[in-house]
A protein has these predicted regions:
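Conserved beta-strand-loop-beta-strand hairpin that lines the nucleotide-binding pocket
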Residues: 1, 42-130
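Bergerat-fold GHKL ATPase/HATPase_c domain
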Residues: 1-36
Length: 130
């Protein structure tokens, strides 16, 4: 588990995601996709919730590479998830591309939010060449 409290933690999570993807045999493009998604989620946790945690797992089997990341925080939650998932929506004056972009970078994307925090689970899945 990687604690997310400040910018250096986001960098550490991004590098760990890239290293996990590389060790799993993913190409540079997929390594970058996974690392970028983790960076976006980590930044949200630090910026909007004053921190959280990131757990990276390799759930691969004989048929496919399957990498999972779970990023959680204990912030105030997201008031309107549907709106937050729209490109361009932001409560902080940013571009509003983080969550929608992360969804596009991921093969699986799940977000749950309440007044006690937000949890985002993403996966990158690739079939192995047999």
């Amino acid at each position: 588990m990687i604690e997310l409290r400040a910018n250096p933690d986001i960098i550490r999570a991004r590098l760990a995601a890239r290293d996990l993807a590389k060790a799993a045999g993913l190409g540079v493009m997929d390594q970058t996709r996974f690392a970028t998604a983790i960076s976006e989620l980590g930044r949200n946790a630090v910026q909007y919730a004053t921190g959280g945690s990131c757990v990276l797992q390799d759930l691969s089997d004989a048929r496919q590479v399957r990498l999972q990341a779970v990023v959680q925080d204990q912030g105030p939650g997201i008031a309107d998830l549907e709106q937050a998932m729209q490109d361009g929506f932001s409560t902080a004056g940013s571009l509003g591309a983080g969550l929608p972009g992360t969804r596009r970078l991921s093969d699986r994307f799940d977000i749950r939010s309440s007044h006690s925090g937000t949890c985002v689970t993403i996966e990158i899945i690739r079939n192995k060449r047999l």
